[in-house]
Regions:
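Solvent-exposed, charged helical/coil patches
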Residues: 1-32, 78, 107-116
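Basic, amphipathic alpha-helical patches used to engage nucleic acids or provide basic targeting signals
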Residues: 7-13, 37-108
Length: 116
């Protein structure tokens, strides 16, 4: 699992690279994020372990994977994580809004789900 996570880190999509450039190094409110981090049997795009907030970026393929994503999210939520999902296009077109939403979620324990 760890070597696959490393492969994903080395082959990040453009939206993943854009978002990582703004999350890395505690740039967002001083919170530490990790990318392509294994949590249980899943690899999460980005996670702030201290706040148990997972950020997932979804491309067009996720429309057909909605059932898998729902099961995956349920397992992660049952372990205390909150999942924020954004479309890749949101990162490339509305990065500031995505960052504001993530920042707010780090301080508000009830934010969870898809943000369109």
């Amino acid at each position: 699992m760890t070597s696959f996570a490393q492969t994903l880190r080395n082959n990040a999509t453009v939206p993943e690279r854009i978002l990582w450039s703004r999350l890395r190094g505690r740039q967002l409110g001083g919170f530490k994020f990790r990318r392509q981090r294994p949590i249980g049997p899943y690899i999460c795009d980005f996670v702030c372990l201290s706040e148990k907030v997972i950020v997932e970026l979804d491309g067009s393929q996720h429309v057909s994977e909605a059932g898998y994503d729902a099961r995956r999210d349920a397992v992660l939520r049952s372990n205390g994580y909150r999942i924020l999902r954004f479309w890749n296009e949101d990162v490339t077109r509305h990065l500031d809004t995505v960052l504001e939403t993530i920042h707010a979620a780090l301080f508000q324990g009830d934010m969870d789900g898809r943000f369109d």
